[in-house]
Amino acid sequence: MNQKLLFIDRDGTLITEPPTDFQVDRLDKLALETEVIPALLALQKSGFRLIMITNQDGLGTDSFPLEQFEPPHNLMMQIFSSQGIHFDEVLICPHKPEENCHCRKPKIKLVEKYLTEGLMDTANSYVIGDRETDLQLAKNMGIQGLHYHPKNLGWFAICEQLTRQDRHAHVQRITKETSINIDVWLDHEGSSDINTGVGFFDHMLDQIATHGGFRMHVQVKGDLCIDDHHTVEDTGLALGEALKLALGDKRGICRFGFVLPMDECLARCALDISGRPHLEYKAEFKHQRVGDLSTEMIEHFFRSLSYAMACTLHLKTKGSNDHHRAESLFKAFGRTLRQAIRVEGDTLPSSKGVL
């Protein structure tokens, strides 16, 4: 399973690097970098696995005997462990630059298995270090690098950057009938830009975003010269996929939502972002169209969305006006979605360990 990994340098990043000889070879030289413990705890809590990777010039030789290296290193590891911080691995290159080995950063020998065995979520893994060699290692690994500096980019700033919610997804779907581009920002409210070519459908999609508490851009070009079938269906598929991607690993979300708004129409919506697609839908309309939207396509839209989003969705409405009945379904779904995508913690809301 791909995991979010942090490859963290030791000297100058986790602990202070002595400016005189650049070796932590005595206990009195050991000092943790500011805020490193609370930052690592928060990063672990948000789902990152920690791997230490360090160059230790001449380790095990007369210039840097093991008996000088081990006491401060072991104490550092004990301190981290006592505070609940655990490293999956500690990767050490003991060679000097002139030995031209294959394991010294920024070369990738030490991290090869993470690149070849599918263990790493490359889009959400980072190298953190205080030297250019750390940034070059990140580049060689095909992941992002963060240049640690206690004043310019310290541990608090790194933690804030990596744990900040920014659930965004972009989906492009192109077929012979439609061309669709959708962007979804689940943690940002504001004006949405929606243009499907079907005015009433645009209004309904805006209801989802407005009542869902998020922002989206939807641009659709479809074969409306025939009818609205492909436009509505494919938009449902693309929007469902975008919502699923934006939710990511779903860690911390409420998962469930239920709403029963009562106005002229009585609409009911229940939602479970379960990974199991299913739709129960009950709505009757007097007319074939509401504005320029076919009423039969409303069910088709929600069915496409629920299957692409991999969620279980129950929708039901009663009322006397077709416009209000249709609108109540989209509003109810938006309000329910708002509940279900809200982040309240950092655990996965499933006893199975996966959604």
Swiss-Prot record:
Main location, first listed in the record:
cytoplasm
Q: Tell me a GO biological process for this protein.
A: L-histidine biosynthetic process
Q: In which pathway does it act?
A: Amino-acid biosynthesis; L-histidine biosynthesis; L-histidine from 5-phospho-alpha-D-ribose 1-diphosphate: step 6/9; Amino-acid biosynthesis; L-histidine biosynthesis; L-histidine from 5-phospho-alpha-D-ribose 1-diphosphate: step 8/9
| Binding sites annotated in the UniProt record for Mg(2+) | 9, 11, 130
Q: What does the record give as EC number?
A: 3.1.3.15, 4.2.1.19
List residues binding Zn(2+). Answer: 93, 95, 101, 103
PROSITE patterns (UniProt xref): IGP_DEHYDRATASE_1, IGP_DEHYDRATASE_2
User: Which NCBIfam families does the protein's record reference?
Assistant: HAD-SF-IIIA (TIGR01662), hisB_Nterm (TIGR01261), Histidinol-ppas (TIGR01656), PRK00951.2-1 (NF002111), PRK00951.2-4 (NF002114), PRK05446.1 (NF003937)
User: Which PANTHER family does this UniProt record tie to the protein?
Assistant: IMIDAZOLEGLYCEROL-PHOSPHATE DEHYDRATASE (PTHR23133:SF2), IMIDAZOLEGLYCEROL-PHOSPHATE DEHYDRATASE HIS7 (PTHR23133)
Can you say what this protein is called? Histidine biosynthesis bifunctional protein HisB
